[in-house]
């Protein structure tokens, strides 16, 4: 990754645009931010820019959603976390925004309005086209430098994500730098053996990751859990029962069965599948071998014998990349697979979690300090692990070529 970082630039007295990802769960009735984790992740970058005029760019949700709102509550939250005043401007690039930025002093933080209030920001476009938008040209004219720190949106190509990097000198913020460094380590220097644990309901993403890390020999083993495992069972010709089969169809993953079969045929010794599962039968947890699942009972977790087997395999790993739960952990009866595997994964030398629900469970279990890295970007992390270059990373590299030293 050949892009600039904060260590490569002088920021004292400069006006610096910083793109963050403050997109958070919000209670629409009270406009209260329910989780400030994403704010906390960006604090080190903002603190590192204490000698500059900092102009923060962020979004909240998207048009049409109930939580698509102004960033007034975000300014209050940031003010409390930074323990300093934050100037909120309900404007993105108009006269009010320009005046607020012009009047700021080094050490000040200005938070502009939700960038998705600008129609241009909601369009996917090439970076060179993004650089020509009114949004980017107006923002770039207000500042000397751009710091991109929003890993959670790095898999998108929209004006403030990739266009600004083509319009002005841009470097990665501390969070972005950390994410790329830790996730790159999975491919370059992770202690062996490396086990990927792929679960949850995003079957297409998990199968793409499995195919990539097995083909390039990044993974020594791939443990398949959750709904992803159900697709692999179908690929083996196993009857998983009507409810689980219907769920795969409803989620639109029928075509993934053939891809799962290709992986099983190509890497028969490298794919781990639970042999025992837990189903909901008469509202109770009942465990069966996968070949004897009752026809009308949904599979909601791994069985105890498989939890023990998988936990042992994880503890014998040097590195683990964990993405997605083993079952419906929101129901206490079906949480043990997810909880126990996450506990086992916490004990290895190098452990990475792909973000999203899994990261939330790790925090809930108090395991966060034991993990090497919890990614802040679910979709971006997955796309990175499939081997694709994220648009924001490509734009950072292009900016450094164009404007860097």
Swiss-Prot record:
<feature type="binding site">
    <location>
        <begin position="59"/>
        <end position="62"/>
    </location>
    <ligand>
        <name>substrate</name>
    </ligand>
</feature>
<dbReference type="GO" id="GO:0006094">
    <property type="term" value="P:gluconeogenesis"/>
</dbReference>
<keyword id="KW-0324">Glycolysis</keyword>
<feature type="binding site">
    <location>
        <begin position="355"/>
        <end position="358"/>
    </location>
    <ligand>
        <name>ATP</name>
    </ligand>
</feature>
<feature type="binding site">
    <location>
        <position position="156"/>
    </location>
    <ligand>
        <name>substrate</name>
    </ligand>
</feature>
<keyword id="KW-0067">ATP-binding</keyword>
<feature type="binding site">
    <location>
        <begin position="21"/>
        <end position="23"/>
    </location>
    <ligand>
        <name>substrate</name>
    </ligand>
</feature>
<keyword id="KW-0418">Kinase</keyword>
<feature type="binding site">
    <location>
        <position position="116"/>
    </location>
    <ligand>
        <name>substrate</name>
    </ligand>
</feature>
<dbReference type="GO" id="GO:0005829">
    <property type="term" value="C:cytosol"/>
</dbReference>
<protein>
    <recommendedName>
        <fullName>Phosphoglycerate kinase</fullName>
        <ecNumber>2.7.2.3</ecNumber>
    </recommendedName>
</protein>
<comment type="similarity">
    <text>Belongs to the phosphoglycerate kinase family.</text>
</comment>
<keyword id="KW-0547">Nucleotide-binding</keyword>
<dbReference type="GO" id="GO:0006096">
    <property type="term" value="P:glycolytic process"/>
</dbReference>
<dbReference type="InterPro" id="IPR036043">
    <property type="entry name" value="Phosphoglycerate_kinase_sf"/>
</dbReference>
<keyword id="KW-0808">Transferase</keyword>
<dbReference type="InterPro" id="IPR015911">
    <property type="entry name" value="Phosphoglycerate_kinase_CS"/>
</dbReference>
<keyword id="KW-0963">Cytoplasm</keyword>
<dbReference type="InterPro" id="IPR001576">
    <property type="entry name" value="Phosphoglycerate_kinase"/>
</dbReference>
<dbReference type="GO" id="GO:0004618">
    <property type="term" value="F:phosphoglycerate kinase activity"/>
</dbReference>
<dbReference type="GO" id="GO:0043531">
    <property type="term" value="F:ADP binding"/>
</dbReference>
<dbReference type="Pfam" id="PF00162">
    <property type="entry name" value="PGK"/>
</dbReference>
<feature type="binding site">
    <location>
        <position position="38"/>
    </location>
    <ligand>
        <name>substrate</name>
    </ligand>
</feature>
<comment type="subunit">
    <text>Monomer.</text>
</comment>
<dbReference type="InterPro" id="IPR015824">
    <property type="entry name" value="Phosphoglycerate_kinase_N"/>
</dbReference>
<feature type="binding site">
    <location>
        <position position="330"/>
    </location>
    <ligand>
        <name>ATP</name>
    </ligand>
</feature>
<dbReference type="GO" id="GO:0005524">
    <property type="term" value="F:ATP binding"/>
</dbReference>
<comment type="pathway">
    <text>Carbohydrate degradation; glycolysis; pyruvate from D-glyceraldehyde 3-phosphate: step 2/5.</text>
</comment>
